[in-house]
């Protein structure tokens, strides 16, 4: 088993990565200084697959478990769903020593984490991500949020989990579309941090799509190490952590304008990564060769490479101005200089963005 420690002082926590470790969650939690009441949050797709095993493991370890099932998908990231979870926590008399466990993908993790961060001003939070995207990205780093009609993740907090347990065996039941969407965030790490990892992905992406256990564990470990390194340097996104937003400026606009759930998060990020790479190419920052490698890999794994036809370029730009990543009314972009190196540009000209979105 691989173990990665996210070093944040008194908010440090371990990430456990292996295959077929879901049945051990009760044992792992017993080793933590936690109360014996748990709220397990999952969705209606994941629940029948994995909730019984997790519940049994927790009960065998002496935990009392309340279970909340939410509808699967981005539309569940709302204050209304959060309120329902608060009610359930009160109904089962959860106190400040009780824990909230997220069993599912990024939506479940974001919502459950938001509830954990705000219920009684914060209770322990455990992540058990079951999608590739959540395993390599959203379960690590402490960003928790719900959506608002004005934008994605606009109501949220930085709230670190107590522990992350990544069981790559859960990816065996992941729909192919979700697996490909998760690969967008995997590719992102190669572009922003590690060019050799990008090269490895070019040669091995088919192993990931074929659910090779060794490849899946390697991907999870590599991505989590990168994410941990960035978060340790800049937990609250005041500086270098913003590089993790590569592809997300345009991506979030696509999600918002299309209606949450039309495109998976990774699909929108893939389109955003290509848009940002094309902007870097046009600005003379990125070479034609590196742009083509980014484009080819995103295309090869089966992710969308062209912007949705129904969205106007100006509409996308207008939506980006409402994004929380804007600074003093200026659009902020993470642009690649080469594979493994990006920079943050805080005053990108609207005309240059419009030219890219119109191509």
Swiss-Prot record:
Location relative to the cell: Cytoplasm
Pfam families (UniProt xref): DHQ_synthase (PF01761), DHQS_C (PF24621)
Residues noted as binding NAD(+) in the record, renumbered to the chain: 106-110, 130-131, 143, 152, 170-173
Gene3D superfamilies cross-referenced by the UniProt entry: 3.40.50.1970, Dehydroquinate synthase-like - alpha domain
GO molecular function per UniProt: 3-dehydroquinate synthase activity; metal ion binding; nucleotide binding
Positions bound to Zn(2+): 185, 248, 265
Catalytic activity: 7-phospho-2-dehydro-3-deoxy-D-arabino-heptonate = 3-dehydroquinate + phosphate
GO cellular component: cytoplasm
Entries under InterPro entries matching the protein: Dehydroquinate_synthase (IPR050071), DHQ_synth_AroB (IPR016037), DHQ_synth_fam (IPR030963), DHQS/DOIS_N (IPR030960), DHQS_C (IPR056179)
Cofactor: Co(2+); Zn(2+); NAD(+)
GO biological process, one term: amino acid biosynthetic process
Pathway: Metabolic intermediate biosynthesis; chorismate biosynthesis; chorismate from D-erythrose 4-phosphate and phosphoenolpyruvate: step 2/7
Residue ranges of the TM segments: none
Cofactor binding notes: Binds 1 divalent metal cation per subunit. Can use either Co(2+) or Zn(2+).
Taxonomic superkingdom: Bacteria
Enzyme nomenclature, EC number: 4.2.3.4
The keyword Amino-acid biosynthesis is assigned to this record: yes
Keyword Nucleotide-binding: yes
Enzyme class: lyase
Keywords from the UniProt entry: Amino-acid biosynthesis, Aromatic amino acid biosynthesis, Cobalt, Cytoplasm, Lyase, Metal-binding, NAD, Nucleotide-binding, Zinc
Similarity section: Belongs to the sugar phosphate cyclases superfamily. Dehydroquinate synthase family.
Function: Catalyzes the conversion of 3-deoxy-D-arabino-heptulosonate 7-phosphate (DAHP) to dehydroquinate (DHQ).
Protein name per UniProt: 3-dehydroquinate synthase
Organism: Desulforamulus reducens (strain ATCC BAA-1160 / DSM 100696 / MI-1) (Desulfotomaculum reducens)
Gene: aroB
